[in-house]
Amino acid sequence: MASLRKTHPLIKIANDALVDLPTPSNISAWWNFGSLLGLCLITQILTGLFLAMHYTSDISTAFSSVTHICRDVNYGWLIRNVHANGASFFFICIYMHIARGLYYGSYLYKETWNIGVVLLLLVMMTAFVGYVLPWGQMSFWGATVITNLLSAVPYMGDMLVQWIWGGFSVDNATLTRFFAFHFLLPFVIAAATIIHLLFLHETGSNNPIGLNSDADKVSFHPYFSYKDLLGFVIMLLALTLLALFSPNLLGDPENFTPANPLVTPPHIKPEWYFLFAYAILRSIPNKLGGVLALLFSILVLMVVPLLHTSKQRGLTFRPITQFLFWTLVADMIILTWIGGMPVEHPFIIIGQIASVLYFALFLIFMPLAGWLENKALKWAC
């Protein structure tokens, strides 16, 4: 008689995704980040749920309620620190996951990749509205600056901004709706994640050499379930260390001051994981141009599959494109640094060069390198 996990309608779904899933035997630790993102999402939903039990989304009490959570709620300080730093780990994992996809050509699974880009946008949106909730100075001014960007939309920009604000400035209505969105979006992300996995399991996983692995597959459990478990332990250890030893390392000191619409902080900047996009936004002097550049800095990922010119899938055997990939990584680091710097010489020009290079690598250099490597292969033969 067949076992229950193979016959029960519900358990069968979990079995096909987590136990009997045929997995390429040679996938490396770079394939761990998908499951780590799942762990991050679950951690964020659970800690967020407990925070929501004590938080009040009213401008007169929001800041005090966060203080109350940290001082009076049992382990409230821990829940808040894990939630705040968990967001950073979420983005570390998501950027590593995307980098893996770019390096090994996983983007050729177009549906999976495009839903992944939508997931990235949803996570960014969730993190942005979440950052506003403590109602500190950087929360308030960050919300003001970023929502104000929508005023660059032709004809309906100002109306759009006021509609999002729920008034003529970032106020109580804004905070209330941002809390509602911040509560709702993680569940939308969870649903999109299931669709992401559904499309992935239609094709099966890619692997480091980019070749068809049908001839060499192993079951997901126990081989990769234990490998994922090791990843969980390492990430949870790192998150715990950060949350317990230096919980405010990645935050902005400005956010310890309650929001004051009459005092502008000297440097308004988002959390570290948005700095690269913020640098691209600031590198264009025109408001609408900057907003479009900001949007395309993420949406450019959607055109990557269309610009794949190489006969090989990954970069494992493609040294020229490898060099360009690591140039992109260095460029992202430079953009992140520039995003946190004041708008003055020499940071302006460095940011502009880095922004041009960012788009050039995706749209020009990488497709060209793929074409060149095809030619080199022909000559070598």
Swiss-Prot record:
Taxonomic lineage from the root: Eukaryota, Metazoa, Chordata, Craniata, Vertebrata
Cellular compartment(s): Mitochondrion inner membrane
Organism: Cyprinus carpio (Common carp)
Protein name: Cytochrome b
Task performed by this protein: Component of the ubiquinol-cytochrome c reductase complex (complex III or cytochrome b-c1 complex) that is part of the mitochondrial respiratory chain. The b-c1 complex mediates electron transfer from ubiquinol to cytochrome c. Contributes to the generation of a proton gradient across the mitochondrial membrane that is then used for ATP synthesis.
Residue ranges of the TM segments: 33-53, 77-98, 113-133, 178-198, 226-246, 288-308, 320-340, 347-367
Gene3D superfamilies xrefs: Cytochrome Bc1 Complex, Chain C (1.20.810.10)
InterPro entries, alphabetized: Cyt_b/b6_C, Cyt_b/b6_C_sf, Cyt_b/b6_N, Cytb/b6-like_sf, Cytochrome_b, Cytochrome_b_C_euk/bac, Cytochrome_b_N_euk/bac, Di-haem_cyt_TM
Binding-site list for heme b b566: 97, 196
Signal peptide: none
Membrane topology summary: Multi-pass membrane protein
Pfam families in the record: Cytochrom_B_C (PF00032), Cytochrome_B (PF00033)
Binding note for cofactor: Binds 2 heme b groups non-covalently.
A Gene Ontology term for the protein's cellular component: respiratory chain complex III
One MF annotation (Gene Ontology) recorded for this entry: ubiquinol-cytochrome-c reductase activity
Subunit and interaction comment: The cytochrome bc1 complex contains 3 respiratory subunits (MT-CYB, CYC1 and UQCRFS1), 2 core proteins (UQCRC1 and UQCRC2) and probably 6 low-molecular weight proteins.
